[in-house]
Amino acid sequence: MTNIHNHKILILDFGSQYTQLIARRVREIGVYCELWAWDVTEEQIREFNPTGIILSGGPESTTEENSPRAPEYVFNAGVPVLGICYGMQTMAMQLGGLTETSDHREFGYASVDLQATDALFAKLNDNLTASEPKLDVWMSHGDKVTRLPQGFQVTGITPTCPIAAMSDESRRFYGVQFHPEVTHTKSGLELLTNFVVGICGCECKWTAENIIERRVARIKEQVGDDEVILGLSGGVDSSVTALLLHRAIGKNLHCVFVDNGLLRLNEGDQVMEMFGDKFGLNIIRVNAEDRFLDALKGIDEPEAKRKTIGKVFVDVFDDESKKLTSVKWLAQGTIYPDVIESAASKTGKAHVIKSHHNVGGLPDYMKLGLVEPLRELFKDEVRKIGLALGLPAEMLNRHPFPGPGLGVRVLGEIKKEYCDLLRKADAIFIEELYKADWYYKVSQAFTVFLPVKSVGVMGDGRKYDWVVSLRAVETIDFMTAHWAHLPYDLLGKISNRIINEVNGISRVVYDVSGKPPATIEWE
């Protein structure tokens, strides 16, 4: 079996908003990596045994006395090190160089003139017409290195940053003031490939096929002949988890699909058809709509709704699990960003804006072992594995759907009438986006039910019915987003269809709020 963890990169996080992008790029190259906080111990690094180390950017200033520093062992481990932005600055400071606050801060696009073609910049040039090689990069820094550590040379400059890149080839230490991990840096992926493959010597074994092989073997090794229970929602994470488990243990997997009445139009039937009929999984469908809606009566505060939905789900799942007395393991679709966010919250550095629908987990008394086959994977990797396992691309690439479902897309108190109207309106919106070839041009699109009525006219009659809002956004990382500029004729067609085909809706509006200041979901 291929050892997919044999070569691996350790990324030390100094707090940059782009740090997870570094990890995703390294994985995209085909090499395993992990993301750890900057203050790890020498013992932890030795135990991980990285093939190379990357120091991320960060919001702090190396000119401040108590700013974060890389563990000294990083520079004594005998492996290549790449410092990015703040990572380059702390490398310079810790190895005897000097940094200062810059008079000319650089934020945005910049052109770096390469001064030497070391191994990091091998074969890189974004401007073939210039006499010297240049790179088109993305800068985001206020400090700069002003004196090199001993043994280093300048490998890149900009008009306002005389040391935009540096290297000590003998020790295989490299620093870049720009961000190769973002797509704005034209040859960023090639630069990271030069480091990970060319300099560190990593083999590209982190592929979907190898991951599936290893995950299936690990599941068999972990659970043996025991039975496993999984809450299957039909979302990407739980779906891929189900297929990995099914491949490993077959009928010993029991999937529980809780139909909470807060799903999209016909979604429950689609889940049963896909996983029961097509893939042959053991699925128990629990029709719990009344139970959820009863629990949500009178609750209009968004966070209280989320908590209630989460609690009822646990109660329903608990009731079903008690019927499966031979089950010894609980499977969850935890992915790597969940692990990172959980670790961050334990340090006290994370601020809860909206609670995650899985927070709290199952009751302690259930005493089940935990199986998390996706724990090492980013979402894009989960999709690639799902595709390799036979899931249709249109399902894997659907827009995100919140864990509480329509519970956070019906504003205020949730009622069955509201959910039914919203389901129909949303289905029309999505159908028309597909028809107009706009669905994959936007990052997320959905309809929101507003608990207000508006006067309308249908034929010769007056109507006084509900209002819905259409929402479509464009984003790269969902941390910030722009509202999508859908064509007016498309919006008009969607509005006309909803008002004419959904009895009970008299007005359709379009949300033109960006994030920030608004969030993508309304609740």
Curated annotation (Swiss-Prot):
Pfam families: GATase (PF00117), GMP_synt_C (PF00958), NAD_synthase (PF02540). GO terms for cellular component: cytosol. Pathway: Purine metabolism; GMP biosynthesis; GMP from XMP (L-Gln route): step 1/1. Transmembrane segments: none annotated. It comes from the Bacteria. The active site is at 85 (nucleophile), 179, 181. It is an enzyme of class 6 (ligase). GO terms for molecular function: ATP binding; GMP synthase activity. SUPFAM superfamilies: Adenine nucleotide alpha hydrolases-like, Class I glutamine amidotransferase-like, GMP synthetase C-terminal dimerisation domain. Disulfide bonds: none annotated. Its EC number is 6.3.5.2. Coiled coil: none annotated. InterPro entries: Class_I_gatase-like, GATASE, GMP_synth_C, GMP_synth_GATase, GMP_synthase, GMPS_ATP_PPase_dom, NAD/GMP_synthase, Rossmann-like_a/b/a_fold. Catalyzes the synthesis of GMP from XMP. Homodimer. This is GMP synthase [glutamine-hydrolyzing]. It comes from Actinobacillus pleuropneumoniae serotype 5b (strain L20).
